Amino acid sequence: MPTHTSKTRKLRGHVSAGHGRIGKHRKHPGGRGKAGGLQHLRSHFDKYHPGYFGKVGMRRFHLMKNPLWRPTVNLDRLWTLVPNETREKYLGKNTEVAPVINVLQSGYGKVLGKGRLPDTPVIIQTRYVSRRAEEKIKQAGGVVELIA
């Protein structure tokens, strides 16, 4: 039933306004933050956060971080990993020094052979390389350096 005044207005003039004599609505009656999830707030945690507490399964002591991790990049995308200034400096010009493209720094693990490379010698550092990619890089006058 709607009333004219709210509960707080009704309780004006009563010493503790419904909050008891001793604590008087002070401090942290249920503990701070998520305290008491296993004790006095258990029903709330069980209903709204099932599985919040406890462990599941077994620990793997000698877990290897994904040994098959090797995101791939194709030959036609190799020059996009290089900054624009470097690209303009080397592409289409005969220079004594070949640019080094470290594929691993860009987040790739393997170079695949799709697409064409410009006829500019380049040194490519990678963990894995396909046979066709290596052939095409050598055909363009470049070198593949395998790094750990």
UniProtKB/Swiss-Prot annotation:
SUPFAM superfamilies: Ribosomal proteins L15p and L18e (SSF52080). InterPro entries: Ribosomal_uL15, Ribosomal_uL15/eL18, Ribosomal_uL15/eL18_sf, Ribosomal_uL15_CS. Residues 1-13, 21-31 have a biased composition (Basic residues). GO terms for molecular function: structural constituent of ribosome. The modification Phosphotyrosine is found at residue 108. The keyword Ribonucleoprotein applies. The keyword Transferase does not apply. GO terms for biological process: cytoplasmic translation. GO terms for cellular component: cytosol; cytosolic large ribosomal subunit; nucleolus; nucleus; preribosome. Keywords: Cytoplasm, Nucleus, Phosphoprotein, Ribonucleoprotein, Ribosomal protein. It is found in: Cytoplasm; Nucleus; Nucleus, Nucleolus. Its main location: cytoplasm. Residues 1-38 are annotated as: Disordered. Pfam families: Ribosomal_L27A. Component of the ribosome, a large ribonucleoprotein complex responsible for the synthesis of proteins in the cell. The small ribosomal subunit (SSU) binds messenger RNAs (mRNAs) and translates the encoded message by selecting cognate aminoacyl-transfer RNA (tRNA) molecules. The large subunit (LSU) contains the ribosomal catalytic site termed the peptidyl transferase center (PTC), which catalyzes the formation of peptide bonds, thereby polymerizing the amino acids delivered by tRNAs into a polypeptide chain. There are 2 genes for uL15 in S.pombe. HAMAP family: Ribosomal_uL15 (MF_01341). Component of the large ribosomal subunit (LSU). Mature yeast ribosomes consist of a small (40S) and a large (60S) subunit. The 40S small subunit contains 1 molecule of ribosomal RNA (18S rRNA) and at least 33 different proteins. The large 60S subunit contains 3 rRNA molecules (25S, 5.8S and 5S rRNA) and at least 46 different proteins. Belongs to the universal ribosomal protein uL15 family. This is Large ribosomal subunit protein uL15B. It comes from Schizosaccharomyces pombe (strain 972 / ATCC 24843) (Fission yeast).
